[in-house]
């Protein structure tokens, strides 16, 4: 197996759904199915925060979600936990600046997908040099889902990455909704990552479809 190509990675980032059990008011397995039916291109398992599952329960839940992603042929990424990603033979892992270092993550993950959250050009360059396949840039807009977020960057912050010669695939993160998706893509992102825009939507299927339409219209 060889590392994913830039072109392929860029396409996969289009509509990036991130979810854990505590992000849903409905059955999370149903929410994921609806999102997959609606057209998400990649999924990240992020079981964190208040009311999150732990231990064996967390592993079993991750396996259920992974099995559903496999049915649809959509990559299953694990947030932060490299050991869990390896145990599940996930398609990849996404790490933040405070998690395990990118060099060690790349070494352990081999040719699997490695995504890194970055907030500055320096962090972005370091991640690229050490094997990141894509960057998560944000928060673009204020978000209530993550409590430990950095300062809001706005679409200008995202555009700055492109102006500084960062050409690696980028997914916009933070406070993204159907209404502001176009501005994120126009600023230079290859795709948008969302939690509540899908997980808390009245119809996760309809919401995903609209996000997919917005992204394709803006690319």
Curated annotation (Swiss-Prot):
Condenses 4-methyl-5-(beta-hydroxyethyl)thiazole monophosphate (THZ-P) and 2-methyl-4-amino-5-hydroxymethyl pyrimidine pyrophosphate (HMP-PP) to form thiamine monophosphate (TMP). Its cofactor is Mg(2+). Its EC number is 2.5.1.3. Signal peptide: none annotated. NCBIfam families: thiE (TIGR00693). The gene is thiE. GO terms for biological process: thiamine biosynthetic process; thiamine diphosphate biosynthetic process. Binds 1 Mg(2+) ion per subunit. It comes from the Bacteria. Mg(2+) binds at residues 80, 99. Keywords: Magnesium, Metal-binding, Thiamine biosynthesis, Transferase. Belongs to the thiamine-phosphate synthase family. GO terms for cellular component: cytoplasm. 4-amino-2-methyl-5-(diphosphooxymethyl)pyrimidine binds at residues 44-48, 79, 117, 146. It is an enzyme of class 2 (transferase). It catalyses: 2-[(2R,5Z)-2-carboxy-4-methylthiazol-5(2H)-ylidene]ethyl phosphate + 4-amino-2-methyl-5-(diphosphooxymethyl)pyrimidine + 2 H(+) = thiamine phosphate + CO2 + diphosphate; 2-(2-carboxy-4-methylthiazol-5-yl)ethyl phosphate + 4-amino-2-methyl-5-(diphosphooxymethyl)pyrimidine + 2 H(+) = thiamine phosphate + CO2 + diphosphate; 4-methyl-5-(2-phosphooxyethyl)-thiazole + 4-amino-2-methyl-5-(diphosphooxymethyl)pyrimidine + H(+) = thiamine phosphate + diphosphate. This is Thiamine-phosphate synthase.
């Amino acid at each position: 197996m060889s590392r994913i190509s830039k072109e392929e990675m860029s396409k996969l980032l289009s509509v990036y759904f991130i979810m854990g059990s505590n992000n849903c008011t409905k059955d999370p397995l149903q929410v994921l199915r609806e999102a997959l039916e609606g057209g998400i291109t990649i999924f990240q398992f992020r079981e964190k925060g208040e009311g999150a599952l732990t231990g064996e329960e967390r592993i079993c839940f991750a396996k259920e979600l992974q099995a559903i992603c496999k049915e649809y042929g959509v990559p299953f990424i694990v947030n932060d936990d490299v050991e869990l990603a390896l145990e599940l033979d996930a398609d990849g892992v996404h790490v933040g600046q405070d998690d395990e270092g990118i060099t060690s993550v790349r070494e352990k993950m081999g040719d699997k997908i490695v995504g890194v959250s970055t907030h500055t050009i320096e962090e972005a360059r370091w991640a690229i040099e050490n094997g990141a396949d894509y960057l998560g840039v944000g928060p673009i807009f204020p978000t209530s889902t993550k409590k430990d977020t950095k300062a809001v960057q706005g679409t200008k912050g995202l555009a700055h990455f492109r102006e500084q010669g960062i050409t690696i695939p980028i997914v916009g993160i933070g406070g993204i909704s159907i209404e502001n998706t176009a501005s994120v893509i126009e600023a230079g992102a290859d795709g948008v990552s969302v939690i509540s825009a899908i997980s808390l939507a009245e119809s996760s299927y309809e919401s995903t479809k609209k996000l997919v339409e917005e992204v394709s219209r803006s690319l």
